Regions:
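HotDog/MaoC-like acyl-thioester-processing domains
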Residues: 1-12, 89-139
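Hot-dog-fold acyl-thioester-processing enzymes
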Residues: 1-76
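Generic structural detector for well-ordered beta-strands
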Residues: 16-18, 84, 134-136
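Short, intrinsically disordered/low-complexity patches at protein termini
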Residues: 37-38, 49, 62, 77-78, ...
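Sparse recognition of residues in long alpha-helices and their boundaries
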Residues: 43, 79, 108-109
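Mid-chain, well-packed structural core segment of small domains
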Residues: 69-97
Length: 139
């Protein structure tokens, strides 16, 4: 896919993710992070949370999926990314990732996306994180 075609086809993309037990335990295994905020319900409650807080970097995994699988080209790679965590994410949350092109550099074929992560709720979706990802085109 040519760069301009990718830009045209990926102006705004939404992808829904689920923080399932498989996602949670899979991340725990690969990160080897057993901090009690993420693993101990009583500890999390003692710190003011209603339950264990999911690993924030699970959202980075969702960004990886967005770039590698949700964009309409496989000829892309992440160059930089950042996420600011605003609210906790919990087990079994449904997360809506909204990505919009923020800037495009035609000369070096780079696209910068603005990212917003929402916890899907019955009444109103809640912004849980935001950030950016810069992608480059593989030649």
């Amino acid at each position: 896919m040519q760069f301009q075609e990718l830009v045209e086809k990926s102006q705004a993309i939404e992808v829904t993710y689920h923080v399932t037990p498989e996602v949670y335990y899979g991340f725990q295994r690969i990160s080897n992070d057993y901090n009690p905020l993420h693993t101990d319900e009583a500890f999390a409650k003692s710190k003011g949370f209603p339950e264990r807080v999911m690993y924030g970097n699970i959202l980075n995994g969702f960004v990886s999926h967005f770039v590698g699988m949700a964009l309409p080209s496989r000829d892309v790679m992440i160059q930089t990314q950042d996420i600011q965590f605003r609210k906790p994410v919990y087990l079994n949350d449904t997360i809506l990732l909204k990505a919009e092109i923020e800037t495009v550099s035609d000369a070096v074929e780079i696209i910068n996306y603005k990212l917003k992560f929402y916890r899907v709720a019955e009444t109103k979706n809640v912004l849980v994180a935001s950030g950016h990802v810069q992608i480059g085109i593989l030649k």
